[in-house]
Amino acid sequence: MSCCGGNCGCGSGCKCGNGCGGCKMYPDLGFSGETTTTETFVLGVAPAMKNQYEASGESNNAENDACKCGSDCKCDPCTCK
């Protein structure tokens, strides 16, 4: 298993994303020295939009629904269509 510990994310086209930053990518998990404060602001909420295919009964699943990143930072299994 890589030092990422499975901290990878599948990106577009079933390629592994750049979520794997290597060892100690999360400072609050055993790495200390600096304190970081993060603030999040929610500026608005958009209305729900209906899918154009909804009436015809077609399914529009997200491209990466079936992708998972394995321990070696490669997608496994990749069954995207």
UniProtKB/Swiss-Prot annotation:
It comes from the Eukaryota. InterPro entries: Metalthion_15p. GO terms for molecular function: copper ion binding. Induction: Strongly induced in seedlings by CuSO4. Abundant in leaves, inflorescences and roots of mature plants. Also detected in roots of young plants, and in siliques. Expressed in leaf mesophyll cells, filaments, stigma and tips of elongating lateral roots. The keyword Ribosomal protein does not apply. One of its GO terms (biological process) is intracellular copper ion homeostasis. Keywords: Metal-binding, Metal-thiolate cluster. The keyword Calcium does not apply. It holds the Pfam family Metallothio_2. Coiled coil: none annotated. Belongs to the metallothionein superfamily. Type 15 family. Metallothioneins have a high content of cysteine residues that bind various heavy metals. Functions as a metal chelator of copper (Cu) and zinc (Zn). Plays a role in Cu homeostasis, specifically in the remobilization of Cu from senescing leaves. The mobilization of Cu from internal sources is important for seed development. This is Metallothionein-like protein 2A.
